[in-house]
Every structure is written in C-alpha cells, then in structure tokens.
Amino acid sequence: MAVIKVRKTGQVIEGEDNVRAFLNSQGVLYEHWDITKLPEHLRDKYVLTDEEKNEILATFKDEIEDLAARRGYKTWDIVALSDATPNLDELLKKFEQVHIHTEDEVRAITAGHGIFIIKGDKETGYFDVELEAGDVISVPEGNPHYFTLMDDRRVVAVRLFIDPSGWVAHPYEEKEEAVQ
C-alpha cells in the first residue's frame, strides 16, 4: 500500500482510504490492483523477456483497458528497472529531474518499489508517494514531479500513454520553492 510523506511538515499518510483522499485532493489519481493475480514466477522478477512483459499485460488486461477507457490512454507497455538494467544510474539521473508532461504520467506497479515526488498545492508543497506492487498512480498533465527508486532499486510497472511516442519529459524550473 502506498505511503505519503509531506516534505514541509513531515506528515505521514497511510492506509488506502487516507492515501486516496489526500492524492485526490491534489488532483492525483490513486487506485490499487489485486497483485495476487500476477503469476508467482513474475512477482519478484526484474529482468523480463518480451514474452514475460506480455504475460504481465495479459494478466492485468481488464484493469488496463478499464483505466484506458476512463482516462483516454491509447497505448501501454512495461518498464523494468533494477541493478541489471544497463545504464540504470544514467536513467535515474534523467528521471530524477523535476519535470512535467503534456499528458498524465501513469504507473501501475507490479513488482518492487518506486517513489514519485510530486508538487502539491501551495499549502502542501512537495510530497513523496512511496509505491509498491498493486499501487496505481496518475500524475496529472503539467504537474511538476519526478520519479526515483527506493533502496532496493527494483521496480516493474505498467505505463499507460495517450501519445504513442511514450514518455516525453519537459524540464520544469522552480519559481518559488525548492524540492526539499
């Protein structure tokens, strides 16, 4: 289950209903998928063949298609990151820059962990959303954020897009408050 940490205040928000309510107040979609549907051999695997990626997509076909129909997503894929990923540190440097997108950034975590650091409203400031398997998040178009891995440096996620070109980040320059 996701855990939120508000950087300004140190407040920690836990529990599915509390997390969903907080994220909803910030315009961020949060859902939870039943990760027990995923075959056991894929639950802790971070180097995936194309066949295994397709198996994950097939497992969550109904959830993906439902989310796509509700939010206008047209294409999806699997991203798998771990210490076995070539150039992982370079990729993380790219991901760890505060940026925006011209569409939602959607991730459904199927294995491992990741953190989205998201700019909330003026009162809230930046907050961390620690995600684990089963957590689904959609950071709205134009909302400053970045993503990084947790200490285990492993994640597998379904990514959904409107634009078939996939993940395209645009730099964001902080005008008033730094990411603390």
Swiss-Prot record:
Binding positions (Fe(2+)): H99, H101, E105, H145
Site residues (Important to generate the dianion), renumbered to this chain: R107
Cofactor: Fe(2+); Ni(2+)
MF terms (GO), sorted A to Z: acireductone dioxygenase (Ni2+-requiring) activity; acireductone dioxygenase [iron(II)-requiring] activity; iron ion binding; nickel cation binding
Pathway given in the UniProt record: Amino-acid biosynthesis; L-methionine biosynthesis via salvage pathway; L-methionine from S-methyl-5-thio-alpha-D-ribose 1-phosphate: step 5/6
InterPro entries: ARD (IPR004313), ARD_bac (IPR023956), RmlC-like_jellyroll (IPR014710), RmlC_Cupin_sf (IPR011051)
Residue ranges that the Swiss-Prot or TrEMBL entry lists as coiled coil: none
Enzyme class: oxidoreductase
A Pfam match: ARD
Biological process annotations from GO: L-methionine salvage from methylthioadenosine; L-methionine salvage from S-adenosylmethionine
Domain of life (superkingdom): Bacteria
Site (May play a role in transmitting local conformational changes): D104
Cited function: Catalyzes 2 different reactions between oxygen and the acireductone 1,2-dihydroxy-3-keto-5-methylthiopentene (DHK-MTPene) depending upon the metal bound in the active site. Fe-containing acireductone dioxygenase (Fe-ARD) produces formate and 2-keto-4-methylthiobutyrate (KMTB), the alpha-ketoacid precursor of methionine in the methionine recycle pathway. Ni-containing acireductone dioxygenase (Ni-ARD) produces methylthiopropionate, carbon monoxide and formate, and does not lie on the methionine recycle pathway.
UniProt subunit comment: Monomer.
Name of the protein this chain belongs to: Acireductone dioxygenase
Organism the protein comes from: Geobacillus kaustophilus (strain HTA426)
Record gene name: mtnD
